[in-house]
Regions:
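Acidic, glutamate-rich low-complexity segments that are typically intrinsically disordered
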Residues: 357-403
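Glycine- and aromatic-enriched membrane alpha-helices
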Residues: 2-359, 403
Length: 403
C-alpha cells in the first residue's frame, strides 16, 4: 500500500509539473504575439528594432526575476544543489518559469507604448529595475500575502483582493507604468503638427493580426493554467475567457467602425479584463465584462491620441491599464453569487486595492522609467527617429569600423 501511495504521489507531482510547464510554454509564446503586434503597428523603419527589443527585454527579465524578483515576491531562491531543486519532479523550478513569463509581460507591454523613440540601452535598464523590484512588490502583495494586505482586506471587507490571472497585478501595472513612460518621453517627432494629430498608419495589418491571434491563443494558457495544478483546472475559466474575448471583439467591431486595429485589439481588451475573475464569474458576466472592455479600449485609445495628445503607440494604457482596472472591479461585480458567480469576493476589496495601487504604480513608473533625469539619455536622437532606430544603429557601427 505504501508503494502504491508513493507511486500515486510521483504521478501527481509529475503531472502537475508537466501541466504548469505547458502553461509556461504557452505564455512564453505570447511574447511572439507582443512582438508581432508591435511590429505590425510601428512604421516599417522600426520593425527590426521592435523585434530585437522584445527578445532582449525577455532575457533581461529572466535574469532579474531569477536572481532578485522571485525572491522578493515569494521568498524563494535557487541557490541550492540541483538535487534539492528536483524534488517533486522539479515543480518549484517550473513554477518559477511560469511566473517569469508573467513578469516578463510587463516590459513587453511598456515597449508597445514607448515604441519608435525610446533608446535601447535605457529601456533594458528600466526593464531590469521593474522586473527585479517594482513588479515583485505588487505580485507578492496579492499572490503571496506579503505585508498582511490581503488579511487586512479580508478582515475589513469580508474577502481578500481577488486577481486569478493578473488583470491588475500584471496588466494594469504594466499599462500604468507605460503611461508614466509615455508622458516622460513625450510624443514621436511629427506626431502632432499645429496641435493636430498626424496619421502614422500601421506598417503591416497582417503582422498586427498575427500578433493578436498568437496572444489570443496563448491567453488560454495564461488564464486556465493559472490554476497551477491539474486538480485546480476549471472549464469555467476557459469558457469565460472565450466569451470575454468574443465580447471585446464585438464591441470593438461595432464601436470601432470596422477599423482593423481596433478589431484586433478588442479581443485582447476582453481577455485582459476577464483575467481577474475568470474563475468566479458566470459566462454571461464574462461576456458583459468583455463588451465593456472592448468599448472602453476604443473610446480611451481615441481620447488619448486625439483629445489628450498622449502618443501611446499601441494603446497599452487603454488596453492594459484601464481594461485591467475594469477587470478587477468587474470581478467584484460579476463574481457575486447574486449575479450568478461563485462568490467569495468583495467589491469593496477590489475597489480599495485599485485606489491604493494607482498611486504606487505611478510612483513605480517614475522610479523605473523615470530614473534617468535627462530626456536625451532616454530617448533616441531626432535623426534616429526620422531614419529609424535600426538604420541609425547600423550607421554608427559603420562609422566605428571606418574609424
Amino acid at each position: 500500500m505504501d508503494n502504491l501511495n508513493s507511486a500515486v504521489q510521483v504521478l501527481i507531482h509529475g503531472s502537475n509539473t508537466l501541466f504548469i510547464l505547458l502553461g509556461a510554454v504557452m505564455v512564453l509564446a505570447m511574447h511572439a504575439g507582443f512582438a508581432f503586434l508591435e511590429v505590425g503597428t510601428v512604421r516599417l523603419k522600426n520593425q527590426v528594432n521592435a523585434l530585437s527589443k522584445i527578445l532582449s527585454d525577455f532575457a533581461i527579465s529572466a535574469l532579474a526575476y531569477f536572481f532578485v524578483g522571485y525572491w522578493i515576491a515569494y521568498g524563494v531562491t535557487f541557490f541550492h544543489p540541483a538535487a534539492a531543486l528536483t524534488v517533486d519532479s522539479g515543480y518549484a523550478l517550473v513554477k518559477f518559469f511560469f511566473l517569469l513569463t508573467f513578469a516578463a509581460a510587463i516590459p513587453a507591454i511598456i515597449s508597445g507604448g514607448i515604441a519608435e523613440r525610446a533608446r535601447f540601452g535605457p529601456q533594458l535598464c528600466a526593464t531590469a529595475l521593474i522586473v527585479a523590484f517594482v513588479y515583485p512588490f505588487f505580485e507578492g502583495l496579492v499572490w503571496n500575502g506579503n505585508f498582511g494586505l490581503q488579511e487586512w482586506l479580508k478582515l475589513e471587507f469580508g474577502a481578500p483582493f481577488h486577481d486569478f490571472a493578473g488583470s491588475v497585478v500584471v496588466h494594469a501595472l504594466g499599462g500604468w507604468l507605460a503611461l508614466a513612460a509615455v508622458l516622460l518621453l513625450g510624443s514621436r517627432n511629427g506626431r502632432y503638427r499645429d496641435g493636430k494629430l498626424v496619421a502614422m498608419a500601421p506598417s503591416s495589418i497582417p503582422f498586427l493580426a498575427l500578433g493578436s491571434w498568437i496572444l489570443i491563443i496563448g491567453w488560454f494558457g495564461f488564464n486556465v493554467m493559472s490554476a497551477q495544478t491539474l486538480a485546480g483546472v476549471s472549464g469555467l475559466v476557459a469558457v469565460n475567457s472565450l466569451l470575454a474575448m468574443v465580447g471585446g471583439t464585438m464591441a470593438s467591431l461595432l464601436i470601432g467602425r470596422n477599423d482593423p486595429g481596433f478589431l484586433h485589439n478588442g479581443p485582447l481588451a476582453g481577455l485582459v479584463a476577464v483575467c481577474a475573475g475568470s474563475d468566479l464569474m458566470h459566462p454571461i458576466g464574462a461576456l458583459a465584462t468583455g463588451l465593456v472592455a472592448g468599448a472602453l479600449f476604443v473610446w480611451a485609445f481615441t481620447a488619448t491620441q486625439v483629445r489628450w495628445k498622449i502618443d501611446d503607440v499601441l494603446g497599452v494604457w487603454p488596453l492594459h491599464g484601464l481594461c485591467g482596472v475594469w477587470g478587477g472591479i468587474a470581478c467584484g461585480i460579476f463574481g457575486q453569487q447574486a449575479l450568478g458567480g461563485l462568490g467569495g469576493v468583495s467589491l469593496e476589496s477590489q475597489a480599495k486595492k485599485r485606489l491604493q495601487g494607482g498611486k504606487k504604480e505611478g510612483e513605480g513608473g517614475r522610479g523605473g522609467e523615470g530614473r534617468r533625469k535627462e530626456r536625451r539619455g532616454r530617448r533616441g536622437r531626432k535623426e534616429e527617429e526620422e531614419e529609424g532606430e535600426e538604420r541609425e544603429r547600423k550607421k554608427r557601427g559603420e562609422r566605428r569600423k571606418e574609424g
